[in-house]
């Protein structure tokens, strides 16, 4: 897909009744109702196939403000759904080193557990840093 191709139309806005219309390659204009959590305005740089239409919630980032580097984002999460694909369930999208992963409830709970475990480890390491900087345990 070429980045210099124009957007098909200005990002369609949601109508008062919660619907929006998307021009697709294979099904013409598709009129759909967006879930209340859908943040995407459904503007595409090229017409998508109907199965590529995506609902996404507003992304939420874990943010940290460090004295050394200032504010930084750590992980992005948000709801995602392809209402016309064979995977029409709602997923949690998580930005990782492996890319943007879509997981169900079990995967989401496991990621949350891993992040809590990592947060505990970071707290332990921060305590160790305090001791090292104070000259203890060197």
At which residue positions do the language-model features occur?
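Positively charged, low-complexity terminal tracts
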Residues: 1-138
């Amino acid at each position: 897909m070429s980045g210099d191709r124009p957007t098909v139309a200005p990002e369609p806005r949601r109508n008062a009744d919660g619907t929006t219309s998307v021009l697709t390659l294979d099904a013409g204009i598709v009129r759909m109702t967006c879930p209340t959590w859908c943040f995407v305005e459904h503007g595409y740089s090229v017409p998508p196939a109907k199965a590529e239409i995506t609902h996404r919630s507003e992304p939420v980032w874990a943010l940290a403000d460090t004295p050394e580097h200032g504010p930084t984002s750590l992980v992005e999460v948000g709801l995602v759904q392809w209402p016309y694909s064979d995977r029409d369930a709602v997923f949690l999208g998580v930005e990782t080193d492996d890319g943007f992963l879509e997981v169900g409830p079990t995967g989401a709970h496991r990621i949350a557990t891993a992040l809590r475990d990592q947060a505990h480890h970071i707290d332990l390491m921060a305590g160790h840093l305090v001791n090292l900087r104070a000259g203890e345990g060197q």
